[in-house]
A protein has these predicted regions:
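Distinct, well-ordered alpha-helical segments
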Residues: 14-19, 44-51, 72-76, 102, ...
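Acidic-and-aromatic substrate-binding clefts and catalytic sites of carbohydrate-active enzymes
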Residues: 11-16, 34-45, 63-71, 94-100, ...
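Aromatic-rich peripheral "rim/lid" segments of glycoside hydrolase catalytic domains that contact
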Residues: 221-241
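Active-site clefts of carbohydrate-active enzymes
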Residues: 183-191, 212-224
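H/E-rich (His + Asp/Glu) clusters that bind or coordinate divalent metals
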Residues: 195-203, 210, 214-216
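Hydrophobic faces of well-ordered beta-strands that scaffold small-molecule active sites
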Residues: 3-7, 33-35, 57-62, 87-89, ...
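Acidic/histidine-rich catalytic cores of soluble enzymes
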Residues: 118-197
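N-terminal pre-domain/capping segments
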Residues: 1-85, 149, 241
Length: 241
């Protein structure tokens, strides 16, 4: 399993100096990154920074509309340049918790999945905690009505008392790429791996059973992001590899 980081974690540093941030993450031991949002960074510049540090951009949290209509081919050219393997969707509660809007979202994601497949890019869905509201109806609805990979976020799910073990038992074979986020019932997201409430031994077991390929660390605390990134990659190696 390769260790990566969601660049949202280091967003403040990334906006100040992308090249230095990528270099620092590589020195910590990260092998790949997951990007997010729009495509304000020049694709050549990003690809060159990653190549210079023997890193890759394995996945992207991309706004769905960038993969539709007139924006599709420009987005695909960008993805090809940076060598993307996974395109992952993440959606707010205003859509996820509305039955009609969620049904429309599922249709759109399914269409984009089919459009990306010929390019060799797999699609997935990244959960927050609101997918587990309403007795987990949104989470189950998405997984029952699509074949998207499940980029399961351990911390977000734990906030709503769900675990990777439970999710994988219901929907096996979808855990190629996982989000490794600590969460504590006492401190919420203000914690690190090994000081939190996530059962990392269970996560490791499921990751191996489901043949996970990428473990992507994410943290919410932007001001201490680089310290968190360094501390937690050491914990990922200790607890998950």
């Amino acid at each position: 399993m390769k260790l990566g980081i969601q660049l949202y974690t280091v967003r403040d540093f990334l906006s100040q100096n992308m090249e230095d941030t990528i270099s620092s993450l590589a020195k910590m031991g990260y092998q790949t990154v997951e990007h997010f949002g729009g495509f304000s960074c020049d694709a050549d510049r990003l690809a060159e920074a990653l190549s210079a540090n023997n890193m890759s951009c394995v996945s992207w949290h991309a706004p769905l509309h960038y993969l539709e209509n007139d924006l599709f081919f420009g987005t695909m050219a960008y993805f090809k340049r940076v060598g993307l393997k996974y395109c992952v969707f993440t959606v707010g509660p205003d859509i996820i918790l509305d039955n009609e809007k969620r049904a429309d979202l599922i249709k759109r994601m399914d269409a984009v999945q089919k459009a990306l497949a010929p390019y060799g890019i797999k699609t997935g869905y990244h959960n927050h905690w609101w997918e587990f509201d309403q007795d987990a109806l949104p989470f189950n609805d998405i997984n029952k009505n699509t074949s998207l990979l499940m980029e399961f976020d351990t911390g977000n799910a734990m906030k709503n008392n769900w675990t990777l073990e439970k999710a994988a038992a219901l929907y096996p074979g979808r855990q190629e790429i996982l989000h490794i986020k600590p969460y504590s019932f006492e401190k919420e997201f203000n914690c690190d791996m090994g000081e939190d409430s996530v059962d990392w031994a269970a996560v490791k077991k499921v990751a191996r059973e489901q043949n996970a390929q990428y473990l992507i660390f994410e943290h919410e605390d932007a001001p201490t992001a680089m310290q968190r990134a360094e501390k937690n990659i050491a914990m990922m190696k200790k607890l998950l590899l």
